[in-house]
């Protein structure tokens, strides 16, 4: 039986992914870069702020100084933070609150493994902080997703090996990170975006404790 569930935040617990997309698109247009559409945005999901900005700059072969890079990253985040001020418990995705309750009542550890530095703020806005045993700090890991560092850190933060954990993700980068950490990925989204070699559910209402147990047992066979 698995001992921990490691949650991504954007696109798994709530739809802050949409706010990230709008904030990146606005920033790109401000600096004269076109092409940050929904298709390109798939590359940014689950990726750190700095790595996302670099991908956008690379799109137009644009070079900026270290100081300007820092300012652009801050500008995007300031815009994003304004957008998420109104996030509330009503924004929690279907099934997630019940899953958190069931995991706690079954003494299964819960950790956040998000690239978002705003993770603690968002959990607080949605009244979910108390369900989490640990929040891995993205600023403390050496490499962002698709590197496995954040999932390894999240598992270790609750005293569990990644191989004894399930990771929940909605992005290609995140799924790769879970695989490389040694945890078992269960994706939410479309197989054409996430790959056909893992279990994928169409929406978060499928994330029940019973379903997670089922997938875990199948993978152990």
Curated annotation (Swiss-Prot):
Q: Which GO terms describe its cellular component?
A: cytoplasm
Tell me what effect the entry lists for residue 45 to A.
20'000-fold decrease in catalytic efficiency
Q: Write the Enzyme Commission number(s) for this entry.
A: 5.4.2.6
**Cofactor binding notes:** Binds 1 magnesium ion per subunit.
- Cofactors that this protein relies on: Mg(2+)
Question: Listed GO molecular functions?
Answer: beta-phosphoglucomutase activity; magnesium ion binding
4-aspartylphosphate, modified sites? 8
Activity regulation information from UniProt? Activated by phosphorylation. Competitively inhibited by alpha-D-galactose-1-phosphate.
What span is annotated as the signal peptide, if there is one? none
Q: What induces it?
A: By maltose, trehalose and sucrose and repressed by glucose and lactose.
Recorded consequence of changing residue 20 to N: 300-fold reduction in the conversion of beta-G1P to G6P in the presence of beta-G1,6bisP
Q: What is the effect of changing residue 16 to P?
A: 500-fold reduction in the rate constant for Asp-8 phosphorylation by beta-G1,6bisP. 6,700-fold reduction in the apparent rate constant for cycling of the phosphorylated enzyme to convert beta-G1P to G6P
Which residues bind Mg(2+) per the record?
8, 10, 170
Q: Where is this site: Important for catalytic activity and assists the phosphoryl transfer reaction to Asp8 by balancing charge and orienting the reacting groups?
A: 114, 145
Q: According to its UniProt record, which residues of this chain constitute the active site?
A: 8, 10
| Record-listed beta-D-glucose 6-phosphate binding positions | 10, 46-47, 49, 116-118
Keyword terms of this UniProt record: Carbohydrate metabolism, Cytoplasm, Isomerase, Magnesium, Metal-binding, Phosphoprotein
Q: What result follows from mutating residue 46 to P?
A: 100'000-fold decrease in catalytic efficiency
**Record has Isomerase as a keyword:** yes
Catalytic activity reads: beta-D-glucose 1-phosphate = beta-D-glucose 6-phosphate
Q: Where in the cell is it found?
A: Cytoplasm
Which Pfam families does the record associate with it? Hydrolase (PF00702)
Q: What else is known?
A: The catalysis proceeds via a phosphoenzyme formed by reaction of an active-site nucleophile with the cofactor glucose 1,6-diphosphate (G1,6-diP). The phosphorylated mutase binds either G1P or G6P and transfers the phosphoryl group to the C(6)OH or C(1)OH, respectively.
Summarize the subunit comment. Answer: Monomer.
Q: Which NCBIfam families match?
A: bPGM, HAD-SF-IA-v3, PGMB-YQAB-SF
Protein name in the entry: Beta-phosphoglucomutase
Identify the taxonomic lineage of the organism of origin.
Bacteria, Bacillati, Bacillota, Bacilli, Lactobacillales
């Amino acid at each position: 039986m698995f001992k921990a569930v490691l949650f991504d935040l954007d696109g798994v617990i709530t739809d802050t992914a949409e706010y990230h997309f709008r904030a990146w698109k606005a920033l790109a247009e401000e600096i004269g870069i076109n092409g940050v559409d929904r298709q390109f945005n798939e590359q940014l999901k689950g990726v750190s702020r700095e790595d996302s900005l670099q991908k956008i700059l690379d799109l137009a072969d644009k070079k900026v100084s270290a100081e300007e890079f820092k300012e652009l990253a801050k500008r995007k985040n300031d815009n994003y933070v304004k957008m998420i001020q109104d996030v509330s418990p009503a924004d929690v995705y279907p099934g997630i609150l019940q899953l958190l309750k069931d995991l706690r009542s079954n003494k299964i550890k819960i950790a956040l493994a998000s690239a978002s530095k705003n993770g603690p703020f968002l959990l607080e806005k949605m009244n979910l902080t108390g369900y989490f045993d640990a929040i891995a700090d993205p600023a403390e890991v050496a490499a962002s997703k698709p590197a496995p560092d954040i999932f390894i850190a999240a598992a270790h933060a609750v005293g569990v090996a990644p191989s004894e954990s399930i990771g929940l993700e909605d992005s290609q980068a995140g799924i790769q990170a879970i695989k490389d950490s040694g945890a078992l990925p269960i994706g939410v989204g479309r197989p054409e975006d996430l790959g056909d070699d893992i279990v994928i559910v169409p929406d978060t209402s499928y994330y029940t404790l019973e379903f997670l147990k089922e997938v875990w047992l199948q993978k152990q066979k």
